[in-house]
From Swiss-Prot:
Protein keywords: Disulfide bond, Glycoprotein, Secreted, Signal
GN (gene name): GP
Location in the cell: Secreted
Protein name: Super small secreted glycoprotein
Pfam families: Filo_glycop
The organism's place on the tree of life at top rank: Viruses
Family, per entry: Belongs to the filoviruses glycoprotein family.
GO cellular component, one term: extracellular region
Glycosylation site residues: N40, N204, N208, N238, N257, N268
Intrachain disulfide bonds: C108-C135, C121-C147
Signal peptide limits: 1-32
């Protein structure tokens, strides 16, 4: 199992090799290349050899497929913003393509959405599809929605990245990142260009400190998912929520969670307590540009008190 972990790109070797590679972005909208199709829970993945111009290659060993995350291009990664990039369509079969290596993702998503009648909006993952294994934050959302279509696609034509497999659709209950597939053509084959994690490392591993990161989970409830106007609630506990109405960072949500607990503002009844953020709150605190450039979040008592005084201005209690 461990030997099947997602291959990683060593940053130093990637930078050195970048002068000698051609990067071809495989966007489904831009290129009409044949892809594998999910049929009856089986995966048929097109061989890469059939997709390249062989007169440009001395050997197909020079060709490496890599998953690149959209968050590196600066897209908003909070749940309200991300869900606006996804939409439902009918009559279009899912397509998949495999890739050999991938980046670590700062933000991944995991959806469990039901229709008003209780049926599932999203299909289960086909056999062999595992969640994206390198996520700093996993945004787990449950809820309901009209889900007007058979499958949830990316409106910009990007892929949903799973463990070494990119799909055009979202699968239920599986971690994924948004991204595209690039083909790297190396000047000469290098066996060490793509390195595998330790052989005993688990695929969905979160605790081994040797990987220099740990996965944190944030939970949400979404109402009217897939419609033009939806409501996203950040879950503090089973009866306490915060309504999210603007872009924000994961670090801000953790600060919010800590502040509500610190000031004991949890629901103390069987009803639901829903906090509404003050319009003057800065939700961009602790933004991370990339893994290597982490800004220290301001975990001070002064900050907590200021946020507390401001965001508790409004609240809504439902029973």
């Amino acid at each position: 199992m461990g030997g099947l972990s997602l291959l990683q790109l060593p940053r130093d070797k990637f930078r050195k090799s970048s002068f000698f590679v051609w990067v071809i972005i495989l966007f489904q909208k831009a290129f009409s290349m044949p892809l594998g199709v999910v049929t009856n829970s089986t995966l048929e993945v097109t061989e890469i050899d059939q997709l390249v111009c062989k007169d440009h290659l001395a050997s197909t060993d020079q060709l490496k497929s890599v998953g690149l995350n959209l968050e590196g291009s600066g897209v908003s990664t909070d749940i309200p913003s991300a869900t606006k990039r996804w939409g439902f369509r009918s009559g279009v079969p899912p397509k998949v393509v495999s890739y050999e290596a991938g980046e670590w993702a700062e933000n991944c998503y995991n959806l469990e959405i039901k229709k008003p009648d209780g049926s599932e909006c999203l299909p289960p993952p086909p056999d062999g599809v595992r969640g994206f294994p390198r996520c700093r934050y996993v945004h787990k959302a449950q809820g309901t929605g009209p889900c007007p279509g058979d499958y949830a696609f990316h409106k910009d034509g990007a892929f949903f990245l799973y463990d070494r497999l990119a799909s055009t659709v979202i699968y239920r209950g599986v971690n994924f990142a948004e991204g595209v597939i690039a083909f790297l053509i190396l000047a000469k084959p290098k066996e060490t260009f793509l390195q595998s994690p330790p052989i005993r490392e688990a695929v969905n591993y979160t605790e081994n400190t040797s990987s220099y990161y740990a996965t944190s989970y944030l939970e949400y409830e979404i109402e009217n998912f897939g419609a033009q106007h939806s409501t996203t609630l950040f879950k503090i506990d089973n009866n306490t929520f915060v309504r999210l109405d603007r872009p924000h960072t994961p670090q801000f949500l953790f600060q919010l969670n800590d502040t509500i607990h610190l000031h004991q503002q949890l629901s103390n009844t069987t009803g639901r307590l829903i906090w509404t953020l003050d319009a003057n709150i800065n939700a961009d605190i602790g933004e991370w540009a990339f893994w290597e450039n982490k800004k220290k979040s301001l975990r001070t008592t002064t900050w907590r008190r200021a946020v507390f005084r401001s965001f508790i201005a409004q609240r809504d209690r439902r029973r």
